[in-house]
Swiss-Prot record:
Disulfide bonds: none annotated. Residues 81-350 form the Protein kinase domain. The chain crosses the membrane at residues 21-43. This is Protein O-mannose kinase. Protein O-mannose kinase that specifically mediates phosphorylation at the 6-position of an O-mannose of the trisaccharide (N-acetylgalactosamine (GalNAc)-beta-1,3-N-acetylglucosamine (GlcNAc)-beta-1,4-mannose) to generate phosphorylated O-mannosyl trisaccharide (N-acetylgalactosamine-beta-1,3-N-acetylglucosamine-beta-1,4-(phosphate-6-)mannose). Phosphorylated O-mannosyl trisaccharide is a carbohydrate structure present in alpha-dystroglycan (DAG1), which is required for binding laminin G-like domain-containing extracellular proteins with high affinity. Keywords: Acetylation, ATP-binding, Congenital muscular dystrophy, Disease variant, Dystroglycanopathy, Endoplasmic reticulum, Glycoprotein, Kinase, Limb-girdle muscular dystrophy, Lissencephaly, Membrane, Nucleotide-binding, Signal-anchor, Transferase, Transmembrane, Transmembrane helix. The gene is POMK. It comes from Homo sapiens. Its main location: endoplasmic reticulum.
Length: 350
């Protein structure tokens, strides 16, 4: 019988991959990995946070809580919350870092009975505006003039530069993340102007430090409105406008319509001071965004692309200023355009 060839018994011998083909495969794999890295760098998603709106009204969920809990009562605040240390004090409230069932929380107490109306207004706004743009309310006790909110260890937005200068946060100290912070801020203003309780104006904003102190920086680098003690209502249909306080304001941070219009020869009198609407918040957006953008690589490029919308925000005529929604849409377009351009340039270099 004729013998079968040796190769037929063992099967076909594997073909050797030419070195050039192997090199091409390696290069293709490297390009794929580089693209993934680029996508992560330029379109880095924020860490997801628990959305308090997933709980029904009057309930909350923080940290690793799986279920929603009702707002804490006076008795629960008195017996279950342990104060640790004071972390802040303003004209209306003093704030204590506290602990509730192994959760770090912020306990706010009224500083003076003279400020009780402001305290109760802030509490009512906090209750009415619960959602992704506002710090989470955990409970309150009007009898004790206290309220409990979620604690955010990075603190006030005024700490932004100090925080981003820390080495562990260098990866988020980019123009992309800073522009997203500016978008967060404008989103909050837009929410207040279209809130469930009408058009609200952020009145505690007569200078940059005061404005920044009204907001919190979260651990995933987003912004939350925190201090809602001065949110008067504007109602255009009924002609209801606002005045932020009863004192004369100065400087170019506040909108022109907030300044005394009758010159130095006429003494300031609150009854003669004209009222105004929510467009005072729009005037301040460029200054706050400039702070948030900082002075890092790429921030001036972003400012250049935002020049036109910021110029419109600074119109002397309030009605000619854009809405917060207009500003937000422009910010999104600039972010998308610059990010796409940088990704395209980076890929061309591969």
């Amino acid at each position: 019988m004729e013998k079968q060839p040796q190769n037929s018994r063992r099967g076909l011998a594997p073909r050797e991959v030419p070195p050039a083909v192997g090199l091409l495969l390696i290069m293709a794999l490297m390009n794929t990995l580089l693209y993934l890295c680029l996508d992560h760098f330029f379109i880095a998603p924020r860490q997801s946070t628990v959305d308090p709106t997933h709980c029904p009204y009057g309930h909350f969920r923080i940290g690793q809580m799986k279920n929603c809990s009702p707002w804490l009562s006076c008795e629960e605040l008195r017996t279950e919350v342990r104060q640790l240390k004071r972390v802040g004090e303003g004209a209306v409230k003093r704030v204590f870092l506290s602990e509730w069932k192994e959760h770090k929380v912020a306990l706010s107490q009224l500083t003076s009975l003279e400020m009780k109306d402001d305290f109760l207004h802030g509490l009512q706004m906090l209750k009415s505006l619960q959602g992704t743009h506002v710090v989470t309310l955990l409970g309150y006790c009007e009898d004790d003039n206290t309220m409990l909110t979620e604690y955010h260890p990075l603190g006030s937005l005024s700490n932004l530069e100090e925080t981003l200068n820390l080495s562990k946060y260098q990866n988020v100290n980019t123009w992309q993340h800073r522009l997203e912070l500016a978008m967060d801020y404008v989103s909050i203003i837009n929410y207040l102007h279209h809130s469930p309780v009408g058009t609200r104006v952020m009145c505690d904003s007569n200078d940059l430090p005061k404005t920044l102190s009204q907001y919190l920086l979260t651990s995933n680098f987003s912004i939350l409105a925190n201090d809602l003690d001065a949110l008067p209502l504007v109602n255009h249909s009924s002609g209801m406008l606002v005045k932020c306080g009863h004192r004369e304001l100065h400087g170019d941070f506040v909108a022109p319509e907030q300044l005394w219009p009758y010159g130095e020869d006429v003494p300031f009198h609150d009854d003669l001071m004209p009222s105004y609407d929510e467009k005072i918040d729009i005037w301040k957006i460029p200054d706050i965004s400039s702070f948030l953008l900082g002075h890092i690589e790429g921030s001036d490029m972003v400012r250049f692309h935002l020049f036109d919308i910021h110029k419109a925000c600074k119109s002397q005529t309030p009605s000619e200023r854009p809405t917060a929604q207009d500003v937000l849409e422009t910010y999104q377009k600039v972010l998308d355009t610059l990010r796409d351009a940088m990704m395209s340039q980076a890929r061309e270099m591969l």
